[in-house]
Amino acid sequence: MQDLSAKQQYNNNKLQKRLRRHIGQAIADFNMIEEGDRVMVCLSGGKDSFAMLDILRNLQASAPINFDIVAVNLDQKQPGFPPEVLPQYLDSIGVEYKIVEEDTYSIVKEKIPEGKTTCSLCSRLRRGILYRTASELGATKIALGHHRDDILETLMLNMFYAGKLKAMPPKLVSDDGKHVVIRPLAYCHEKDLIRYAEWKEFPIIPCNLCGSQENLQRKAMKEMLNEWDRRFPGRIETMFNAIQNITPSHLMDHKLFDFKSINSSSGVIDGGDIAFDKPDIPAVPQLMVIEPDDRVEIIELN
């Protein structure tokens, strides 16, 4: 690992502490990992899954519960995939692991026309293999490396293209109904994961070896959110807070709230209607932040 100045080391320690806190909080908030769990960490070779594995192992050493970790990588036989990189890294850190070799690349190439995105079919094939592997390994949880930015991008994609108010759940039952899938990075910022991967010098494997065209809609959402973050600091955090602070009675989904039964004797619900009032909305985002000395305070972002 690179030689670091005292200031760099201080900043890196703060970064690691922040990621530990975010992952630990997500685990606690959604009861992601329990006593005796065997957590299968899906390792793609990208920055996010490397960071997830590293921090989970770090937390494992000090957690008040006992749980096991097994890292799993799916070698899909994509051209140029370096099969030696992940085993060498995983051997060096002493973690239990399994490399699953399945030629899904040939299947995808056969089914998808040249130039079209292969991600959807590839993901379905990959999920099935990972579910099977989890059963073979006796894993009780499957950990995926999606972070806060992925969740917000998915929220915007569903709003703009599918007409749904839907993002990525932090915890769910797998498609086959046999496993619990968790996303420990749900509270983590992508920019923190990028910095962490650079510091730790993870042996990153490119994600475009398959030659698939990038998902243009998701790329557009990412660029839009990044632009908002640059122009309006704090807005992205506020958006993320919003999906954790939902008032069904003030939306329009009658499956979530029984609007039909409301009558004059129902009383005021969730603050009533503010259509005729001045909106009680702050001019700038107000966020809870953790200062370096771990004191919590409200700050206003200009």
From Swiss-Prot:
Keywords: 4Fe-4S, ATP-binding, Cytoplasm, Iron, Iron-sulfur, Magnesium, Metal-binding, Nucleotide-binding, RNA-binding, Transferase, tRNA processing, tRNA-binding. Binds 1 [4Fe-4S] cluster per subunit. The cluster is chelated by three Cys residues, the fourth Fe has a free coordination site that may bind a sulfur atom transferred from the persulfide of IscS. GO terms for molecular function: 4 iron, 4 sulfur cluster binding; ATP binding; magnesium ion binding; sulfurtransferase activity; tRNA binding. The keyword Iron-sulfur applies. Its EC number is 2.8.1.-. Its main location: cytoplasm. It catalyses: cytidine(32) in tRNA + S-sulfanyl-L-cysteinyl-[cysteine desulfurase] + AH2 + ATP = 2-thiocytidine(32) in tRNA + L-cysteinyl-[cysteine desulfurase] + A + AMP + diphosphate + H(+). A motif (PP-loop motif) lies at residues 44-49. Its cofactor is Mg(2+); [4Fe-4S] cluster. The thiolation reaction likely consists of two steps: a first activation step by ATP to form an adenylated intermediate of the target base of tRNA, and a second nucleophilic substitution step of the sulfur (S) atom supplied by the hydrosulfide attached to the Fe-S cluster. This is tRNA-cytidine(32) 2-sulfurtransferase. The gene is ttcA.
